[in-house]
């Protein structure tokens, strides 16, 4: 496979998608692998450092229907399938996170707890009022948070096994991607949907305090896209995917953004493995995974 170098320069786009950069340095991403179209609506990928393996959620057919044909794949970090249908019996799994040697997956209105050692489902925590549980993240206490994009809500599985609504506020602006840093949760907002998943004003990054649930925008609150995955870059900024427009963005603490990659629509919940300098992105509509080296 030929390797493609992507050189990212400072750009400014005017209008509602305001994308600028505070960085003067050139950023280089090298495409290192891309799978064939072998997945079934892959939504999220997460890295298990302990086992040096990736897990990929496959919605399979319909993200809103309880069809029972969703699954989770096990994949090597060089893009090779280890077990395509490692976990079965899911409906439409989306966000993934790992805590205390368990894998958690959102599944429409449920949070699924999986024993990583065996691949067996341990628990299904149901939130009857939830519509579209999306990304999921764990705090340092082992509590699990899940975004319900269409109800402007965050659910939490606490330390005693209670899964309930933790926060409901329109200021979340359709929360999608979640990333926990200490006592803060970084949220990739989709923006207020006006017709299905379309928006007049796209979303930006939000910060929610895990202490007092206060909500604020990251930096200047410029609309940047219909945000999906959010991961830290290790230097105070974030790699973020725009699902609708198929973009990889680099968002600074002041809210300014650099366009890193033009991908295809459906760029979903990415994983960033800092120690390997690797970014892995599910291309949901293309049924592929693609990986880039940070140079």
Residue ranges and their predicted role:
Residues 29, 110-111, 116-141, 147:
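Asp-box/WD-like beta-propeller blade repeats and closely related beta-sheet repeat scaffolds
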Residues 74-77, 99-101, 156-162, 179-183, ...:
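Flexible "stalk/tail and boundary" regions
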Residues 38-51, 57, 62, 67-69, ...:
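Beta-rich, blade/repeat-based domains predominating
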